[in-house]
A protein has these predicted regions:
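N-terminal membrane topogenesis motif
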Residues: 1-20, 190-194, 206-215, 219-268, ...
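Signature of the first transmembrane helix
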Residues: 2-59, 96, 266-289
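Interfacial segments at transmembrane-helix termini and the short loops linking adjacent helices
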Residues: 34, 103-121, 291-294, 355-385
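Transmembrane helix-bundle signature of multi-pass secondary active exporters and lipid flippases
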Residues: 44-55, 268, 275, 287, ...
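Helix-loop junctions and terminal segments of transmembrane helices
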Residues: 55-71, 140, 300-328, 399
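Alpha-helical transmembrane segments of multi-pass membrane transport and lipid-handling proteins
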Residues: 82-110, 164, 337-366, 375, ...
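Hydrophobic alpha-helical transmembrane segments
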Residues: 115-122, 148-200, 428-453
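Membrane-interface junctions at transmembrane-helix termini in multi-pass inner-membrane proteins
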Residues: 128-149, 382-408
Length: 460
């Protein structure tokens, strides 16, 4: 119950932001042409693929800052954040310029009607990295109320801007520009929260308790011998050697921290990028193979993939909780169970409606012209329910430092690509291929979580 109470406010904020986005999605479905809506769905899928690597930094931030807090090294956080922000800004600018130059080529490869919105989508994916950095700092500090507010800021600003820009005639480009601006506004809000809370000032906020003994991720703090007081004898050669050894240990620990952060971010980069592929490969491949089906399939895709977005919101609670408990030699199965329980509510509702009244729901939400993929609705809802569980399992495994999850996700993405591509753009066949892959992957990743937990219990 305690875990449920901790996750519920964040889940509520995420649900509010998601509900607002759903409302706008339904509205612009009626404002855009069928082909235009299909193109927007492809660009949104591209954004989520690009945002997953950016979110990898969030995982690395949470794990590394949690480890630094355990060994009373909050002094390292501010310098690292400043340096990382500088490098990230340079990369965002360069990537955005490259996106402008290549927007025509990318639009042609994706079989889009025009390059409109491509550069904005790519730039939004790059800026997401900055937002992920700041959200990671909020998560590592367990600042869940400001984090929940930040989700609402992003969601509501995206909604308002999308309606306004599409209404003035900017169409797909206006919708993608709204995504870019909402990410920028959310990052500004996160920066403001971090400044106000001052979470990582070592002179004001005490560090967390140290990790369990023998924790290789955080390292054990080394205490230097105190200098002699006035009148006391000068330390002998043995004491001087101890001082030198301490200095070398500190430098070694700092180097270990940098290497560990690089590995954490690299692992999360691969894992979350693969989750992005698994989430959107069906939309991209179907739209490329059969553009005439893209709009109708996008309608069911938008509805079902809200479950994945809900899982990502819940991961904002699960990730820091699992990382913190891992450093204490404990598991976070109660927190994982709480997030799965919350996720089960919208999943059950969507599965019920998509099975018994798919065409009616799509007709009310999107209009009669986007109901052609209704027979695939329930199947895709089941597939995305499985993927949502995989998202939670993956974040749990990343939080406890299990890097083999990348190979499982890579295998799943490869299987999904082959199976979906072989369906040649048929909505029902595409959804079935997706379900086969996602169900198998959820089972394997869930088993991995249980294996890791049993192993940690035996060790402890």
């Amino acid at each position: 119950m305690k875990a449920l109470r901790g996750a519920s406010p964040l889940a509520l904020a995420g649900m509010l932001a998601t509900a607002a986005n759903v409302g706008v999605t339904l509205l612009i479905a009626r404002m855009l042409t069928t082909r235009g809506y299909g193109a927007l769905a492809q660009l949104i899928a591209l954004f989520f693929v690009l945002s997953m690597p950016g979110s990898a930094l969030l995982v690395g931030v949470v794990r590394r800052v949690t480890a630094w807090r355990r060994v009373s090294r909050l002094d390292l956080v501010a310098d690292w954040v400043r340096a990382t922000r500088r490098r990230a800004l340079v990369l965002v600018i360069l990537f955005s310029l490259l996106a402008i130059a290549l927007r025509g080529v990318i639009a042609e490869w994706m079989n889009l009607p025009s390059p409109a919105g491509v550069a904005e989508t790519l730039s939004a994916g790059a800026v997401w990295g900055l937002l992920s950095l700041d959200r990671g700092l909020l998560q590592a500090g367990h600042a869940y109320p400001p984090l929940g507010r930040n989700l609402i800021v992003e969601g509501l600003s995206r909604c308002l801007l999308t309606v306004a820009l599409v209404a003035v005639g900017l169409g797909v480009q206006g919708a993608t520009l709204a995504i870019l601006l909402s990410v920028i506004f959310a990052d500004l809000d996160a920066r403001r929260s971090l400044t106000a809370l001052d979470l990582y000032d070592p002179t004001r906020i005490p560090a967390d308790p140290g990790p369990a003994a023998g924790d290789p991720a955080a390292g054990d703090p080394v205490v230097a011998p105190a200098p002699p007081a006035a009148g006391e004898p000068t330390p002998d050669a043995g004491a001087m050697r101890a001082v030198v050894a301490h200095s070398e240990a500190v430098h070694s620990n700092d180097a270990h921290s940098r290497r560990s952060l690089t590995v954490d971010v690299g692992t999360a980069l691969a894992a979350l990028a693969l989750l992005g592929v698994l989430q959107n490969i069906d939309v991209v491949l179907l739209g490329r193979a059969e553009p005439s089906n893209a709009g109708a399939y996008a309608a069911i895709s938008v509805a079902t993939k809200l479950l994945v977005l809900a899982a990502l919101v819940l991961s904002s609670f699960l990730l820091p909780e699992a990382a913190a408990r891992r450093h204490l030699g404990e598991h976070a199965l109660h927190q994982l169970g709480a997030t799965l329980t919350i996720l089960a509510i919208p999943a059950a509702l969507l599965l019920t409606v998509s099975f018994f009244a798919p065409r009616q729901l799509l007709g009310v939400a999107f209009g009669g012209r986007l109901t052609a993929a209704a027979p695939a609705f329930a199947t895709l809802a089941a597939a995305m329910s499985c993927l949502a569980m995989t998202v939670l399992f993956t974040h749990y495994l990343l939080a406890v430092g299990r890097r083999r999850i990348v190979f499982l996700l890579l295998a799943g993405a490869a299987v999904a690509t082959v199976l979906i591509a072989s369906r040649h753009g048929a909505p029902v066949a595409t959804a079935r291929a997706d379900l086969i892959t996602q169900a198998g992957l959820a089972a394997v990743t869930g088993a991995s979580v249980l294996h890791v937990t049993r192993k940690s219990v035996r060790v402890s």
